Swiss-Prot record:
UniProt-listed NCBIfam families: PRK05610.1, uS17_bact
Function: One of the primary rRNA binding proteins, it binds specifically to the 5'-end of 16S ribosomal RNA.
One GO biological process term: translation
Gene Ontology annotations for the cellular component aspect, listed alphabetically: cytosolic small ribosomal subunit
Keywords (A to Z) from UniProt: Ribonucleoprotein, Ribosomal protein, RNA-binding, rRNA-binding
Cysteine pairs bridged by disulfides in the record: none
Gene3D superfamilies, per database record: Nucleic acid-binding proteins
Domain of life the protein comes from: Bacteria
GO MF entries: rRNA binding; structural constituent of ribosome
UniProt name for this protein: Small ribosomal subunit protein uS17
Protein family membership: Belongs to the universal ribosomal protein uS17 family.
Transmembrane segments: none
Organism whose genome encodes this protein: Deinococcus radiodurans (strain ATCC 13939 / DSM 20539 / JCM 16871 / CCUG 27074 / LMG 4051 / NBRC 15346 / NCIMB 9279 / VKM B-1422 / R1)
């Protein structure tokens, strides 16, 4: 069984690649405080379909490049309230 994580896309600038931030929470072994740790994974996005803010699931795959060993398997949720992206605003004439 391959390892899977759920995270949020934090960058989609590269071609066929997205950066996915995965957060994990755990209780500190000595003090008991809940600690949050995060890690960014470079994940393969074949069709450039995932955008910043999307919650996605990634799965471990064979190495695709030097830093890419993860692939986006599915979209879990898109952020609400963001109707236009920066690129759409620039095409429309820069009026926001």
């Amino acid at each position: 069984m391959k390892k899977t994580f759920t995270g949020v896309v934090v960058s989609d600038k590269a071609d066929k690649t997205v950066s996915v931030k995965v957060e994990r929470r755990f209780a500190h072994p000595l003090y008991g405080k809940v600690v949050t740790r995060s890690h960014k994974y470079a994940a393969h996005d074949e069709n450039n379909e995932y955008k910043i803010g999307d919650r996605v699931e990634i799965i471990a795959v064979r190495p695709i490049s030097k830093t890419k060993t993860w692939k986006v398997t599915k979209l879990i949720e898109r952020p609400r309230g963001i109707e236009t992206t920066l690129a759409e605003t620039e095409v429309a004439g820069g009026e926001a």
